[in-house]
Amino acid sequence: MIRNISLSIKDIFQNMQDAEEFIQGLSYDQFVADKRTFNAVVRSLDFIGEAAKNVTNEIREKYPLVPWKEMAGMRDKVIHFYFGVDREAVWIAVKDRIPAVRPLIEQILKDLGKR
């Protein structure tokens, strides 16, 4: 059964917000020292990547600026962590990549609401 695309996009948006909220006010050193926060952020990245994998080709083609493949790839890296999770990559994803992509995801939600 194919999941409603709106739900997948909402999951991406919500987990982006969550990840940003989890690290709010933390330095990199505080983040990597806080196991609970680190694990919560990794879980959010898992949800984002899994939901990105469920996005249809139609949506991917309509919104090519969204790094769909990279979001799914990050999920695989943090979940399968073959040689340990790269904490700096997780930090950069949440501090730099998510804030850049979140407005694009928000626009998709608005566009889907107009259907």
Regions found by a protein language model. Name each.
Residues 1-115:
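Solvent-exposed interaction patches of small proteins and small membrane subunits
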